[in-house]
Design a protein with these regions (language model features):
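Bacterial signal peptide processing site
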Residues: 29-32
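C-terminal motif of bacterial Sec signal peptides marking the signal peptidase cleavage site
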Residues: 24-27
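N-terminal secretory signal peptides that target proteins for export/translocation
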Residues: 1-8
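Sec-dependent N-terminal signal peptides
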Residues: 8-19
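Secretory/export targeting leaders with adjacent low-complexity proregions
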Residues: 40-313, 320-324
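C-terminal soluble interaction/assembly domains
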Residues: 313-423
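C-terminal segment of N-terminal export signals and the immediately downstream linker at the start
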Residues: 34-38
Length: 423
C-alpha cells in the first residue's frame, strides 16, 4: 500500500508520516476570536455519504472522461476480478457511515463496475457519457470533515522498495513481524478489536513501545531491515517489495494491526522541534533520522499502533486491501468501515507534478485500498505508483477536493452481469 497506512492494506500514505494537523489563522479584526480549525480525519457519527437529488448540482465528468485511458481500464479489470470472488459478498450491503441506511448491495456494486466500463466504451462524447451515467447511476458525495462541508483531504501513497534479509545479520537488525494468534479483528471490516486472553476476554493490545521493550514478538520476525525507520515506513504504507542480499525479491503485505491509536511521525517531529512545518517531508524525516536515530525512534512510539505483515508471491504486487493490484492514478484508499469497496469514484482535487507545479486533477478511480491513517469521511489516499518519482509525488500530495461514488441504481443491477472471467 505501498507507502501509506497499513492495511491491508491496506497501504499507507507518505503524508501519514509527514503531515501535521492544519493550523488556524488569526482573524483580521482583533476583537473577533477566530473559529478553531476543524482537523482532518475525525471519526464521524452519522452518514458518510449524501445522495445528490434531482435538484442538486451534479459534478461534471468532462475532464475525467477526457483523461480516461489504459490505467483506468486496468483498474476496472482489477475490481471486476475482486467482485468475481465469492468472498467479496461478505462486505455488502454497505451501510452509510454509522447509520442503518444502505448505500449499495453487492449486486449494485459489482454490476456498477460492469455498467461503468460498458458506458465508458460506448459513449461518443463527454456529454453522451454524462447523460448515460446519470440515467443509471446515483451519485453520492462524501460529507466531508464536519459532516456538511463535503471537503475531502487527498494525500498520496506509493509502493516503496527496500533492502532486507530473511535472517538477522550484519546491517539488517530491524524486523517486521507476523500477525500474532491473539490479535482480534472484525471479520468483515477488518477493524482491530484488541487481544484475546486465555479466558476468552478481549483487552486492548500493547502499545508500540511496550511491544518493543517486552520482547513478546520474539520469534515472529518475518524479515529484517536496515533501519527502524524503514520498518516504520513500511508499517505506515502497509506493503513493500524488499530486495534480499542475493538479489531476489520478497513481497510483504498488511496482515492486521493493533487497536491502539495512530499518531503521525511528522507531527511528532514538529512538536519536538526536530523539523519545521514548512520543511516537512519524507526526505527531511530521513535526514533527521540519520543525524539522531534515537530521537526519532523515541517519537515513533507516540504512534501506539503496530502493524503486522505476511509474505505473498508478488504476482499482483502492489496489492491493496482487496488483494488486487492497485494502479497508478486509478486506485484510491479510503476508510472501508464507511465507504464501499471496489466501486467507481470521481476525484476532483489538485495534484503535484515534477516540474510544472500543482495541477487540477479530475479522474475516475476505483476504491481498492485502505490505510491506517485513512480513517474518516474526509480522507482519501491517491496511489502514485512505484519507486523514487512516485515517492516525490506522493510526498507533495496534500490538497482538498471532492469525492463522489457512482452507485448503480438497483433497478439496473440485473442488466449488467459480471463477465465469466472477471475481465
Amino acid at each position: 500500500m505501498i507507502v501509506r497506512s497499513a492495511r491491508r492494506r491496506g497501504l499507507a500514505p507518505v503524508l501519514a508520516l509527514c503531515t501535521v494537523l492544519p493550523l488556524g489563522l488569526a482573524g483580521c479584526q482583533k476583537e473577533k476570536t477566530p473559529e478553531p480549525e476543524i482537523p482532518w480525519g475525525l471519526p464521524i457519527d452519522g452518514p458518510a455519504l449524501v445522495k445528490l437529488g434531482p435538484g442538486d448540482p451534479k459534478p461534471s465528468f468532462a475532464a475525467a472522461f477526457s483523461a480516461r485511458g489504459r490505467n483506468l481500464d486496468e483498474s476496472l479489470a482489477q475490481s471486476l476480478s475482486w467482485f468475481q470472488k465469492p468472498s467479496s459478498k461478505q462486505f455488502f450491503p454497505q451501510k452509510n457511515g454509522t447509520t442503518a441506511e444502505n448505500v449499495a448491495t453487492w449486486e449494485q456494486a459489482s454490476a456498477g463496475v460492469v455498467a461503468f466500463r460498458q458506458i465508458l466504451a460506448e459513449s461518443s462524447s463527454a456529454t453522451d457519457f454524462q447523460t448515460r451515467i446519470e440515467q443509471v447511476f446515483d451519485i453520492w458525495q462524501s460529507v466531508g470533515k464536519d459532516g456538511t462541508d463535503r471537503q475531502v483531504l487527498f494525500t498520496g501513497y506509493y509502493s516503496p522498495e527496500f533492502k532486507g534479509s530473511r535472517t538477522r545479520s550484519g546491517r539488517f537488525q530491524h524486523p517486521l513481524h507476523r500477525r500474532p494468534a491473539d490479535l482480534v479483528t472484525d471479520p468483515v471490516t477488518g477493524e482491530p478489536k484488541g487481544r484475546r486472553l486465555a479466558d476468552g476476554s478481549v483487552v486492548s493490545y500493547a502499545t508500540r513501545g511496550e511491544l518493543a521493550r517486552s520482547g513478546e514478538l520474539a520469534g515472529a520476525e518475518l524479515v529484517w531491515l536496515e533501519s527502524s525507520l524503514d520498518a516504520y515506513i513500511i508499517q505506515v504504507n502497509g506493503s513493500a517489495r524488499i530486495t534480499m542480499p542475493d538479489g531476489s525479491n520478497m513481497f510483504v503485505g498488511y496482515a492486521g494491526k493493533t487497536d491502539r491509536p495512530y499518531f503521525g511521525l511528522g507531527r511528532s517531529m514538529v512538536d519536538a522541534g526536530l523539523l519545521t512545518e514548512d520543511r516537512l517531508s519524507l526526505a527531511s524525516i530521513r535526514s533527521a533520522y540519520r543525524k539522531d536515530p534515537a530521537a526519532v525512534e523515541a517519537l515513533m512510539e507516540r504512534n501506539e499502533s503496530y502493524v503486522f505483515f505476511t509474505e505473498y508471491d508478488g504476482s499482483n504486487w502492489p496489492a491493496g486491501s482487496l488483494g488486487v493490484r492497485v494502479t497508478e492514478g486509478a486506485s484510491i484508499a479510503t476508510d472501508k468501515k464507511i465507504f464501499p469497496r471496489g466501486g467507481v469514484t470521481l476525484v476532483n482535487t489538485r495534484t503535484p507534478t515534477i516540474s510544472r507545479g500543482p495541477e487540477n486533477f479530475s479522474r475516475f478511480m476505483l476504491d481498492q485500498d485502505t490505510g491506517g491513517a485513512i480513517t474518516a469521511a474526509d480522507r482519501a489516499d491517491l496511489y502514485m505508483g512505484i519507486g523514487a518519482t512516485a515517492e516525490i509525488l506522493a510526498g507533495g500530495q496534500y490538497f482538498p477536493g471532492s469525492l463522489y461514488y457512482l452507485i448503480l441504481k438497483p433497478e439496473y443491477a440485473s442488466q449488467y452481469p459480471l463477465p465469466a472471467n472477471g475481465r
